[in-house]
Regions:
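Short aromatic/hydrophobic "clamp" motif used to bind/position activated sugar donors
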Residues: 32
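Acidic donor-binding segment of Leloir-type glycosyltransferases
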Residues: 1-13
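C-terminal, non-catalytic tails of nucleotide-sugar-dependent glycosyltransferases
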Residues: 70, 82-110, 119, 156, ...
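Catalytic metal- and UDP-sugar-binding loop of GT-A-like glycosyltransferases, i.e.
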Residues: 10, 35-37
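Conserved donor NDP-sugar-binding/catalytic core segment of glycosyltransferases
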Residues: 39-84
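Glycine-rich, basic loop-to-helix element that forms the pyrophosphate-binding segment
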Residues: 10-27
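A short, conserved alpha-helix in the catalytic core of glycosyltransferases
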Residues: 46-50, 104-129, 134-165
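Short glycine/serine/threonine-enriched helix-capping/active-site loop
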Residues: 62-65, 159-160, 167
Length: 225
């Protein structure tokens, strides 16, 4: 109910990591939810499904199946190495597609999930000191966070049953200005340096599959080491 909702005013320039850390400081629950303001619910029981996984002892971060406004897949887990950093699994696939080895329709583990819709225990959040607001203000903070949580000995889960629309970048716009592009490149470089080994060999993704496209296709001979 609205009586249980508290609206906080963040008194500083946009910094996705800092804003979410600020919100968590005021939260009282044992499970934290990061939900972007451009998210729209499709599955009525989405939260029940995601909390069911988040409260398991073996689970760290839990992400959802996110769709573009035209119902194409926007997010069905995160694969390390796409674009040199990380990208969304099965991006632009039809909503009805099962995906590679049913990984769109089946709940399964990924190294990371997007924080556009992410649940995690408060204890895990505190254990890794939240999101990195100094080095990752906008991009890749969720990937960095998921990998830190994974380091606690738990698995990050993509919850296929929870479907939501993600009207991506409607509120902020795209990072197309020179300043935003420079910031993105700095954050990409930080991720590549901090998680070099994981990006080179994502344990949730086959080394025989390409990192050139987000579609789980087999590597071309020119991509083989």
């Amino acid at each position: 109910t609205l009586e249980r909702v508290t609206v906080l005013e963040y008194p500083a320039p946009f910094n996705y990591s800092a804003i979410n850390n600020f919100g968590v400081k005021h939260a009282r629950g044992s499970i934290i939810g990061f939900i972007n303001n451009d998210i729209e619910v499709i599955t009525p029981q989405w939260l029940t499904y995601m909390v069911g996984h988040a409260q398991r002892e073996s689970v760290g971060c839990v992400g959802a199946k996110l769709l573009y406004s035209d119902t194409r897949i926007q997010h069905a887990g995160v694969v390390l190495g796409y674009g040199g950093g990380a990208g969304h699994a099965h991006k632009n696939f039809p909503r009805s597609h099962a995906g590679y080895l049913d990984r769109i329709t089946a709940t399964n583990n990924f190294s990371a999930v997007t924080a556009a819709c992410l649940l995690v225990k408060r204890s895990h959040f505190d254990a890794v000191n939240g999101l990195n607001e100094k080095k990752l203000a906008v991009a890749f903070n969720d990937v960095d966070f998921c990998l830190k949580v994974n380091g606690l000995g738990v698995s990050n889960v993509y919850c296929a049953e929870a479907e939501l629309f993600h009207h991506e970048s409607v509120s902020r716009g795209l990072d197309v200005s020179p300043e935003k592009a420079a910031r993105f490149n700095r954050e990409l470089t930080y991720l590549q340096t901090a998680w070099k080994a994981q990006i080179k060999n994502d344990p949730a993704y086959s080394p025989n599959l390409t990192l050139k496209r987000e579609n789980f296709s087999i590597k071309n001979p020119t991509e083989l080491e």
